[in-house]
Amino acid sequence: MTIRSLPALSPLALSVRVLLMAGSLALGNVATAASTPAAPAGKNVTWEDIANDHLTTQDVLQYGMGTNAQRWSPLAQVNDKNVFKLTPAWSYSFGDEKQRGQESQAIVSDGVVYVTGSYSRVFALDAKTGKRLWTYNHRLPDNIRPCCDVVNRGAAIYGDKIYFGTLDARVIALDKRTGKVVWNKKFGDHSAGYTMTGAPVLIKDKTSGKVLLIHGSSGDEFGVVGQLFARDPDTGEEVWMRPFVEGHMGRLNGKDSTPTGDVKAPSWPDDPTTETGKVEAWSHGGGAPWQSASFDPETNTIIVGAGNPGPWNTWARTSKDGNPHDFDSLYTSGQVGVDPSTGEVKWFYQHTPNDAWDFSGNNELVLFDYKDKNGNVVKATAHADRNGFFYVVDRNNGKLQNAFPFVDNITWASHIDLKTGRPVENPGQRPAKPLPGETKGKPVEVSPPFLGGKNWNPMAYSQDTGLFYIPGNQWKEEYWTEEVNYKKGSAYLGMGFRIKRMYDDHVGTLRAMDPTTGKLVWEHKEHLPLWAGVLATKGNLVFTGTGDGFFKAFDAKTGKELWKFQTGSGIVSPPITWEQDGEQYIGVTVGYGGAVPLWGGDMAELTKPVAQGGSFWVFKIPSWDNKTAQR
């Protein structure tokens, strides 16, 4: 293995250079199908299969392990009594030199594991043996602009096709048996910063009865306007597109439909000197829905996070001599309920109005039944935001039900006002403009930093304990303003930063929290940042991975560490579990990378010793152990 040797990064400049290098390294990729035998034909995946993904155990068909994104499994063959006997069943190496940034959640169907790799690759593996069935290597151009490493977070499956996105702004359908391309659709200009890193998902529109493929764009840090797409999964043709910057025009059936919100976009300042009549930032305003959407079939609503506004600099999105609190930069840094029939916005709740800190609202939206302090049940979303607060929102209308901190020492706001739904900001936490003649403003110490109290790595919800298991980080940053102007293909931030430790003995924390009271039930600390997702099971277990390569299991009620295994590289992906031939399997993608080593300042230095890698590991109780492997 190669030991990571990225240097500590000065704010912005070196990060961008490393990202551009990532694009050039990918040039040698060639689109291929494996010469090994095709995957078993199996049955086509139906919408009913996907709709029941959270209930069934033999497959994992959707990102989040169900349309509700709870990452909860009813499997209990592996449990708190026998997890110490968990051993590797097999592992598969992704091979070649692309050993970094493996953030993929695998899916499983009919005895085949489909897992994506960094640099826009897909692998089909026999779920019992790890035998490679086929590989797809997407050929990438040398001018891709991924902000946060060359990652891919997963694929989707429906019918006889596998779907995934690429770093050159494409969504592709592959034949699930052979890996051959069925269709390939370009949705944005990759040289301007459009990419796709999140896993697409399938939903079924109750109104039309049609199954749709839903995916978003990435690229906020390069000044793109974020877009959510619905496609025909058979042909790849666009059904609708919804932009997440107020006043930008949507599309329906290939024609302009309606603007998002008010066509005059009052939440963005006017500027009569420009072609649009709005400030420059409005044309490059971000809001990209780069994480996977959840779907509520009861209300027929797609629910997805909207990314940070562009640029990060709050003053570029505020009128001259104006107050940032008068310009919310809609529809960024929040959660959006979208009508699957038309792509219209049904409701919007903003976590961070006029976000000055890159607190992108993209973290997963978990659908669950929330019981308030009076015992009333609300169909809700749960969201642990990068800004450090945990939100419970009514998924019927987007109204806030509860909010509380899930990390320590939040500086930018004192609390979330439950009546207004808005944060109560602390004075002095929006960095001031540079003084005349200066190139940067006075630094401010902010917590959480822009990488968040929790980033994209998804939490899990246990239907047994009623707790959320949140992989967070306790850290802070020095943060200052810089001059900013849009240039195609260049980072569009207007801010400088350096992330620092908050505590000497740990950065990462896995916390079990009660969504009604906000109470911390238990906590596990890690020396390195936590960037892996979480899995909860009926076996009273919680699984996650660590930056130094351990895959770990905890008692879901007490937080006691029950088992761990060294995989050889840092884990920055969500684990899954499934049942096959009467045995429970647990799988996780392994290979360090992602945003921390690229953007993390002191944290990049901390993670230097972590080995790079690229593999998929599968564990189970040994078949010969019939005494404790309860079936």
From Swiss-Prot:
CDD domains listed in its UniProt record: PQQ_ADH_I
EC annotation from Swiss-Prot or TrEMBL: 1.1.2.8
Cofactor: pyrroloquinoline quinone; Ca(2+)
One Gene Ontology MF term: alcohol dehydrogenase (cytochrome c) activity
UniProt modification remark: The disulfide ring formed between the two adjacent cysteine residues Cys-147 and Cys-148 is essential for efficient electron transfer at pH 7 from PedE to its natural electron acceptor cytochrome c550.
Record-listed pyrroloquinoline quinone binding positions: 103, 153, 197, 215-217, 386, 531, 595
Entry binding sites for Ca(2+) 1: 53, 56, 59
Reactions that this protein is recorded to catalyse: a primary alcohol + 2 Fe(III)-[cytochrome c] = an aldehyde + 2 Fe(II)-[cytochrome c] + 2 H(+); ethanol + 2 Fe(III)-[cytochrome c] = acetaldehyde + 2 Fe(II)-[cytochrome c] + 2 H(+); butan-1-ol + 2 Fe(III)-[cytochrome c] = butanal + 2 Fe(II)-[cytochrome c] + 2 H(+); butan-2-ol + 2 Fe(III)-[cytochrome c] = butan-2-one + 2 Fe(II)-[cytochrome c] + 2 H(+)
Residues reported in the UniProt entry to bind Ca(2+) 2: 221, 308, 358
Compartments, as annotated in UniProt: Periplasm
Keywords assigned by UniProt, alphabetized: Calcium, Disulfide bond, Metal-binding, Oxidoreductase, Periplasm, PQQ, Signal
Cofactor: binding details: Binds 1 PQQ group non-covalently per subunit. Binds 2 calcium ions per subunit. One is located in the active-site cavity near PQQ and the second calcium binds at the N-terminus and contributes to the stability of the native enzyme.
Induction context: Repressed in the presence of lanthanides.
Note: The soil-dwelling organism P.putida KT2440 produces 2 PQQ-ADHs, namely, PedE, which is Ca(2+)-dependent, and PedH, which is lanthanide-dependent. These enzymes are crucial for efficient bacterial growth with a variety of volatile alcohols. The functional redundancy of the PQQ-ADHs and inverse transcriptional regulation of PedE and PedH represent an adaptive strategy of P.putida KT2440 to optimize growth with volatile alcohols and aldehyde substrates in response to the availability of different lanthanides in the natural environment of the bacterium.
Protein name: Quinoprotein alcohol dehydrogenase PedE
Gene: pedE
